[in-house]
Swiss-Prot record:
This is Annexin A3. Annexin repeats lie at residues 19-90, 91-162, 174-246, 250-321. Inhibitor of phospholipase A2, also possesses anti-coagulant properties. GO terms for molecular function: calcium ion binding; calcium-dependent phospholipid binding; calcium-dependent protein binding; phosphatidylserine binding; phospholipase A2 inhibitor activity. GO terms for cellular component: axon; cytoplasm; dendrite; membrane; neuronal cell body; nucleus; phagocytic vesicle membrane; plasma membrane. The modification N6-acetyllysine is found at K178. The lineage of its organism: Eukaryota, Metazoa, Chordata, Craniata, Vertebrata. A pair of annexin repeats may form one binding site for calcium and phospholipid. PROSITE patterns: ANNEXIN_1 (PS00223), ANNEXIN_2 (PS51897). The modification Phosphothreonine is found at T268. GO terms for biological process: animal organ regeneration; defense response to bacterium; hippocampus development; neutrophil degranulation; phagocytosis; positive regulation of angiogenesis; positive regulation of DNA metabolic process; positive regulation of endothelial cell migration. Keywords: Acetylation, Annexin, Calcium, Calcium/phospholipid-binding, Phospholipase A2 inhibitor, Phosphoprotein, Repeat. It comes from the Eukaryota. The keyword Acetylation applies.
Length: 324
């Protein structure tokens, strides 16, 4: 079953035992179609079922009522609450495809979102996302990235979008030494920087392999790779490579940083908040919570609590799954 690509050991949401899609579909129908919406029932059912189970509810709902659950939720709910509830019933690859489309639509491109999605998804996930993107928009993800970005940033994004990163857990010490030297020769050691070498190594090697490479890099250059990237590169390309380094070292910490960014300051970036909470809820949200507490001195739960309100707050806290 394809869903296993999207499930990890450290999620806050798991399969619901004794799951019965027709019972759930009926309860949801009642919650939507009664006088006034019973938000509590909707929240409880959708946050206590895995995405694979929600897909079965969507199917059952369509068969029983000849009505799309998504359309009914959209018709009945509104605002950020509606967005997160619709996200919950969307298959993961389709959800990511939509988020990528949204980040490239209209005036200006949301580079941070492109970087976040493309650096945190596995190669196999990227292949599914590209398929979902084509199915939804009849356009290649590659082509849209190409027309919305440029230069070395574009090249690196396309390399990631192709899903060519090695996924094996084997590490090759000789290759790590060689790559570390290549990075050093391409940056610190020469006048000007050979950006292609950075893209090739950072966007194609496996995370375990890169970890070893970064250790070797420090031995050769007496510098941390992050400092070299900051010194040698600039703009969105620099941001992307720094994100790769941070994900290599600790993906949950990188995503905790993104959540902190989304929650701090005057406004809340609900687009990012919804995306990370929903997309990591069955993968590593427990680890993200731990990193959030460690780095920012308060729990993710309390940060969400103080920054959101109403049913929107309730559903996010349910996904969060507990206070730390």
């Amino acid at each position: 079953m394809a869903a296993s690509l999207w499930v990890g050991p450290r999620g806050t949401i798991n399969n619901y035992p004794g799951f019965n899609p027709s019972v759930d579909a009926e309860a949801i129908r009642k919650a939507i179609k009664g006088i006034g919406t019973d938000e509590k029932t909707l929240i409880n059912i959708l946050t206590e079922r895995s995405n694979a189970q929600r897909q079965l509810i969507v199917k059952q709902y369509q068969e029983a009522y000849e009505q799309a659950l998504k359309a009914d939720l959209k018709g009945d709910l509104s605002g950020h609450f509606e967005h997160v509830m619709v996200a919950l019933i969307t298959a993961p690859a389709v959800f990511d495809a939509k988020q990528l489309k949204k980040s490239m639509r209209g005036m200006g491109t949301d580079e941070d979102t492109l970087i976040e999605i493309l650096t945190t998804r596995t190669s196999r996930q990227m292949k599914e996302i590209s398929q979902a993107y084509y199915t939804a928009y009849k356009k290649n993800l590659r082509d849209d990235i190409s027309s919305e970005t440029s230069g070395d940033f574009r090249k690196a994004l396309l390399t990631l979008a192709d899903g060519g990163r090695d996924e094996s857990l084997k590490v090759d010490e000789h290759l790590a030494k060689k790559d570390a030297q290549t990075l050093y020769d391409a940056g610190e050691k020469k006048w000007g920087t050979d950006e292609d070498k950075f893209t090739e190594i950072l966007c194609l090697r496996s995370f375990p392999q890169l970890k070893l490479t970064f250790d070797e890099y420090r031995n050769i250059s007496q510098k941390d790779i992050e400092d070299s990237i900051k010194g040698e590169l600039s703009g969105h390309f620099e941001d992307l490579l720094l994100a790769v380094v941070r994900c290599t070292r600790n993906t949950p910490a990188f995503l905790a940083g993104r959540l902190h960014q989304a929650l701090k300051g005057a406004g809340t970036d609900e687009f990012t908040l919804n995306r990370i909470m929903v997309s990591r809820s069955e993968i590593d949200l427990l680890d993200i919570r731990r990193e959030f507490k460690k780095h920012y001195g308060c729990s993710l739960y309390s940060a969400i609590q103080s920054d959101t309100s109403g049913d929107y707050r309730t559903v996010l806290l349910k996904i969060c799954g507990g206070d730390d």
